């Protein structure tokens, strides 16, 4: 009876071990039947991975239950404090989670920088406008001052030329030793140049007054500044030449015959003619300034 019970217990144990529902057979590497389809811990056929503890898988959904990959290993906790050699080490930016925040931060910084630059340009625009307005006002004041100076020198030229040719035209003596300016070509040359300079300076004085009053010349043409500059240069050289010739004639007369009333009047006329030359030289500088300033603008 005892033998039968032992045999039956052995057969039951063997049948229990060979049973497909037995957990021993489920974990046995010698099992040929594989896992039961009804089991929760079913692994797919031909899976290259062996799951040692299937219960560790969280049953979130069917895809997670039947995943052939093992569960990810959680990262180790950080060390506090870090080792001395790692305190100054740079953290590598390899993870995808680190890339997106850094790119977003850089993008935002670019947008902010652009906005600041745009604001700076807009704020600087009125300053440039004020500077240009101030420059225009200063230029207008400078033009007015130049116009008044030019008018003053034109009036001076008119007065000096009138005095010079008037004295030369009146240089005549009576008597047996009488003499006249028209007998000497140097004096006639000086008289003619002073008359021409007087006519031109009178016309330019009227033109300058018209420009100050109406801001327009009497004769508006494209080459007005060039004409004025050329005439000022020409008459200045002519006055210098005529005055020098007349002064040479007076010096020759005084060295041979001495001083008298005739030579004294000629000397006075020549001196005023030199002063007129100085006024025309200043007018030539003013006209050259106007010419090159208007040409550059």
From Swiss-Prot:
The chain crosses the membrane at residues 150-170, 192-212, 226-246, 266-286. Residues 1-20 have a biased composition (Polar residues). Residues 1-135 are annotated as: Disordered. Residues 1-149, 213-225, 287-297 are cytoplasmic. Pfam families: CASP_dom. It is a multi-pass membrane protein. The keyword Membrane applies. It is found in: Cell membrane. Keywords: Cell membrane, Membrane, Transmembrane, Transmembrane helix. Residues 69-83 have a biased composition (Pro residues). GO terms for cellular component: plasma membrane. Homodimer and heterodimers. This is CASP-like protein 4A2.
